[in-house]
Amino acid sequence: MKPADFAQSMERALRREDGPATAGANDLSFANAWQRVEEAAAKRIAAVDAGEGSDPDGFEGAYVRRVLELAPAGSCLFAANSMSVRAVDTFYLKGAKQLIVLANRGLNGIDGTVSTAIGASRCFGRTTLITGDLTMLHDLNSLALQRELRVQRQLADIAGDANRTPEQAAKRNTCETDTGAQGITIVLLNNNGGAIFDMLPQKSQEAYFERLFLTPQDVDFQAAVAAFGVPYSKTATLAEFDRAYRASLDVPGISFIEVPVPLQGLRERYADYW
């Protein structure tokens, strides 16, 4: 339809003389069709949470669903940019549990994500950051805040709530929610590169696509995280992830869970959900 034809159709609809438009049989049929499609999509997403599918242990969406299921109600979920925020948007179904969902887009998109999430954990209490490896690398030095968090906790234990001024107590009550030990769990969905670019048409250019677009980094995150004294675990299955994530919820400060996922084939893995 040409823009002019569309505008004329809208004008005729607005000038109708038979009163307000009411939903006819065709309108209801169209709405019902959309509702059926939405319900079918919700069932497919719920099946991911149940570990169904051809390879749930290698699918980013399955781990995002587990975080959404296991995160304490009222806690903060921080979604990094690129595929992380898209996965949260895709797999976060409407439900009874309420989460504080945050995101931050830096000047270059992914810069400052980790430090922002750590800052959010100081205000909202228990926080989970879902991030990819390139975003993590861009702000890796934020893990140095582990020492500062440890010092602050030690000072708080020494001072005790009894020695706080009324203003300090009010601020503490405002910025800390009752969601377990204050801290942040970083869930690294490590596809060793920029898997989001796997959806580009340039994918067919095998001679340069991986080197210039996917940019695999081959970083040893266990060694990198250890340099900052951050507790680390690596999981290869949903069952292992469940155990590691549940355990991290009782750890103050920063804890780190690495989940290896495939670099290529992202378009195919998400085909049933987009």
What do these predicted regions represent?
Residues 1, 8, 21, 76-77, ...:
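Hydrophobic beta-strand segments of well-ordered beta-sheets in folded domains
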Residues 33-124:
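Active-site diphosphate/adenylate-binding microenvironment
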Residues 90-274:
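Thiamine diphosphate
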Residues 1-36, 146, 160, 201, ...:
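Glycine-rich, acidic loop regions that bind phosphate or pyrophosphate groups
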Residues 3, 20-27, 49-57, 78, ...:
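Hydrophobic alpha-helical scaffolding
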Residues 10-21, 38-45, 49, 68-71, ...:
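Structural signal for hydrophobic packing residues in well-ordered secondary-structure cores
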Residues 2-9, 26, 33, 59-67, ...:
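General structural feature for long, well-ordered alpha-helical segments within catalytic domains
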Residues 26-53, 120, 187, 196-203, ...:
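Charged, low-complexity, helix-prone segments enriched in Lys/Glu/Asp/Gln
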